[in-house]
Amino acid sequence: MPAPCNCIETNVCICDTGCSGEGCRCGDACKCSGADCKCSGCKVVCKCSGSCACEGGCTGPSTCKCAPGCSCK
């Protein structure tokens, strides 16, 4: 029985409730953006240049929205 957080084996992306943080394997198919993401390696990180803040709706580099006049990395 694969761990509930192992989305490579289960093909189901569970990040928050139901995932204890054990046996995390996310892969490209499973990325979490919520603060309650138990698997640190699954967390989507949006980085903006300098001290610019990230705006909501960021699910990865391609959808990263930074404050106006800022660029995403």
Swiss-Prot record:
Residues involved in Cd(2+) 2 binding: 19, 24, 39, 42
Induction notes from the record: By cadmium.
Positions that bind Cd(2+) 4: 46, 58, 64, 72
Residues annotated as binding Cd(2+) 6: 54, 66, 70, 72
Protein name from the UniProt record: Metallothionein 10-IV
Function as written in the Swiss-Prot or TrEMBL entry: The metallothioneins are involved in the cellular sequestration of toxic metal ions.
Record family assignment: Belongs to the metallothionein superfamily. Type 2 family.
Residues given in the record as Cd(2+) 5 binding sites: 48, 52, 54, 58
InterPro entries reported for this sequence: Metalthion_mollusc
Binding residue positions for Cd(2+) 1: 15, 19, 32, 37
Chain positions recorded as Cd(2+) 3 binding sites: 26, 30, 32, 42
Keyword set, alphabetical order: Cadmium, Metal-binding, Metal-thiolate cluster
Assembly description: Monomer.
Presence of keyword Ligase: no
One function term, GO molecular function aspect: metal ion binding
Organism of derivation: Mytilus edulis
